[in-house]
Amino acid sequence: MTVRPIRPSDYDAINALHRRVGWPERSLAGWRWLEANPARREVRAPPGWVSVDAEDRPAAVVCNFVQRFGHAGRPLHGATGFSIIVPPERKGASRGLIRAFLDQPDLFARYTLNANALSAPTYGLSGMKAWPPTTHALKLPWIVDPAACLRSRVWRALLSRIPAEAAHRVGERVMNARLDAEPALRLPPGVFPLTDLSDGSAYGAFWRRLSAEDRVLADRNPATLRWRLADPDQIRRPLLLAHARNGRIDGIALAIVAKANILDAPSLEIIDLTALEGAIARAVSSLGAV
């Protein structure tokens, strides 16, 4: 099975693979946003790989998201494998795709998130290990809309016996109407929405202090965060909050609305929650209370 890097001409076929499993498709603007990832360009990594058929058409795919990291002033790069789609008739193609992902040069880490029970053994066969060893399977959900969760389960049961692509034609069934409205946030003292991400902003000063500390950090400098928040395919604008003490930011939280497919209830996923040394307990407690 031939594996090669993704090309722009593959996007329609990759979206068709997403439809087959009931996953959201990317718009052309969304694919171009991924192409523009500055970290990916620095290490000249492809946006992913496809396993192709005899006519060189994508028949299976893994996408590649490169991020900058840093430790004590040393720049690092890591990559996340995502949207791994291997139809039943391409059984075995996952190994070549995962191997292409793992063989990328100039990276200190290669990983994937949210591996389900069906796909997890495939990663183990490729030499990947669950990490952290004791908490990798731990999730902490707060159910705030039980009715939406129940509707999601009912629709899954009703549509479980038909192909995901056919289920996709049923259309959206569990989107929460509240997502179309700007929420009135009740924020703890010291917590506020963060809107100024210019290089000379209070957030920029926070990032410079944070990146000087002796720990590995995902790069969230102002320019990177501006690019990250500009994803044209996001369901709604991410929630970015800061905690400040004595007029200086000492912690931030970033959360996004996630919805893996039309049958999933929307959820708010915390993807960043970090603070300066010495302010972790105070800032994380306040930000987490939101």
Language-model regions: role of each:
Residues 129-216:
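Acyltransferase donor/substrate-recognition loop-hinge adjacent to the catalytic core
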Residues 3-84, 190-275:
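A conserved beta-strand-loop-helix scaffold within acyl/acetyltransferase catalytic domains
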Residues 70-153, 258-290:
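Acyl-donor binding region in acyl/amide transferases
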